[in-house]
């Protein structure tokens, strides 16, 4: 019996010594590789600790350098190297990696230069499995040339069941994970020379993406932004109290994709400003259905909900230099099937928008808008109804834009139903009113009334209320492909107004 125990103890001792010896070998190998990278100027660190019992190691005050890109951390800890996975499966595997206080500075230059990346030494196709990656209290910055375009402050990130597999050609991105959690602080991203995006907090878990205080802010004042424009462009000032994606999914198989069962946005303030004194942008504009079709990734949002939206649109007029404006209050939007996948399917679901709002803050307005993403002619239908619209409400836009002033009793009801494609639109328009007068204004600073032209104009305004009985047909409204869909829709409305009152 003693002999058996002795053999068993010797066996255990040999295994233990072998394990410790293997760890010593691995420790020295890691240290040798680190020394080589230090000599090449790719890495620097203060201390290296290897735990022979747990097959774990730690680096203190670490800095990685690749060209202009620099990644530093107060410490990096790698827990439990799994030798058996490498011996039997050829996979480098560790239980966990924790990176404390990472500072990531990424740099891109637009100037052409020789690629300084090291040549593939044969190890870069090695599959790597990591049970968990944690980044705690990190900061990130990304610059293009001398301009810092992105910063993210005080973020925590956790990935679970990470696989890095360069050889798997079916993955667009050779990095996959089962779950992710992000708790991020302030983000700042320069969208363009005109706009900057900011947010106060970003939280991601396996079920939802939650964003607070998202803002798209102008980089210039309304007076100054036109000085940097080559052609007309909207200046946007938009804030979202909260943006939430529920039941989302990222896909990196074959084609990058994103889906969510619900995208909700709450408490939105949107101010859009356009100056028509700037040269026209004559590039062709896409219909919204084509925009979705042409996305470089698959997108599928089952339901979109916007609540408590206040929207203002301002336009500086080319002829007068005056600013016309319209606004919508308490807007609620619900949309279904915002998707480009699978495009080309005969049963591709119709994209639907249902909108309710207060036009000019007082008049109820509802709109239903439909289109088919997979239709190459970009067919659509948009219907709606407005009620109790005071002519005076229209003057904030009519006076600067058309040099006309509307007066009279409120328009009791207004209905429209337009359908078409990217070329032409037709439909019906109805306006119920009793007494509407049009005053044509003089082209002077006082905006006094041109009595003669006003008298002639009102001879042609229909004073009797026939609209309750007969719809007005709107026919063959041609779309200007250099203008937006909303300009197209506005032209349909104007055609209906002209046929109704004149």
Where in this protein do the model-derived segments appear?
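Solvent-exposed beta-strand/coil patches in large extracellular/periplasmic or lumenal scaffold regions
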Residues: 121-139, 250, 285-430, 491, ...
């Amino acid at each position: 019996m003693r002999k058996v125990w002795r053999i068993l103890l010797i066996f255990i001792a040999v295994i233990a010594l072998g394990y410790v010896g293997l760890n010593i070998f691995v420790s020295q190998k890691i240290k040798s590789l680190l020394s080589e990278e230090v000599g090449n100027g790719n890495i620097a660190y203060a201390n290296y600790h290897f735990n022979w019992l747990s097959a774990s190691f730690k680096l203190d005050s670490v800095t990685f350098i690749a060209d202009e890109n620099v990644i530093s951390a107060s410490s990096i800890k790698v827990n439990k190297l799994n030798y058996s996975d490498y011996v039997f499966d050829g996979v480098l595997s560790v239980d966990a990696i924790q990176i404390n206080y990472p500072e990531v500075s990424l740099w891109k230059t637009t100037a052409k230069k020789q690629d300084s990346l090291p040549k593939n030494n044969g190890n870069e196709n090695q599959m790597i499995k990591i049970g968990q990656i944690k980044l705690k209290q990190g900061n990130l910055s990304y610059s293009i040339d001398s301009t810092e375009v992105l910063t993210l402050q005080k973020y925590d990130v956790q990935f679970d069941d990470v696989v890095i597999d360069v050889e798997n050609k079916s993955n667009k991105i050779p990095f996959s994970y089962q779950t992710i959690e992000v708790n991020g602080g302030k983000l700042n991203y320069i969208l363009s020379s005109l706009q900057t995006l900011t947010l106060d907090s970003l939280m991601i878990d396996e079920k939802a993406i939650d964003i607070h205080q998202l803002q798209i802010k102008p980089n210039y004042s309304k007076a100054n932004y036109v000085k940097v424009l080559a052609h007309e462009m909207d200046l946007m000032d938009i804030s979202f109290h909260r943006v939430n994606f529920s039941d989302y999914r990222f896909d990196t198989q074959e084609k990058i994709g994103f889906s969510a069962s619900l995208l909700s946005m709450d408490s939105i303030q949107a101010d859009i400003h356009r100056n028509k004194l700037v040269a026209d942008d004559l590039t062709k504009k896409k219909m919204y259905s084509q925009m979705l079709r042409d996305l470089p990734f698959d997108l599928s949002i089952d339901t979109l909900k916007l609540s408590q939206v206040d929207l203002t649109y301002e336009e500086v007029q080319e002829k007068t230099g005056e600013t016309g404006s319209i606004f919508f209050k308490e807007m609620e939007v619900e949309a279904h099937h915002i998707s480009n996948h699978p495009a080309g399917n005969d049963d591709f679901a119709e994209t639907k928008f249902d909108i309710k709002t207060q036009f000019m803050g007082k008049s109820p307005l509802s709109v239903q808008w439909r289109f088919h993403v997979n239709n190459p002619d970009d067919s659509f239908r948009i219907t709606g109804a407005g009620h109790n619209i005071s002519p005076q409400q229209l003057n904030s836009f009519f006076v600067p834009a058309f040099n006309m002033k509307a007066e009279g009793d409120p328009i009791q009801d207004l209905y429209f139903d337009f359908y078409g494609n990217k070329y032409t639109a037709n439909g019906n328009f109805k306006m119920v009113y009793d007494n509407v007068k049009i005053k044509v204004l003089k082209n002077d600073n006082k905006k006094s009334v041109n009595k003669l032209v006003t008298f002639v104009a009102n001879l042609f305004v229909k004073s009797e209320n026939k609209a309750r009985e007969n719809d007005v047909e709107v026919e063959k409204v041609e779309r200007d492909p250099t203008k937006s869909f909303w300009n197209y829709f506005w032209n349909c409305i104007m055609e209906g107004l002209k046929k109704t009152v004149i």
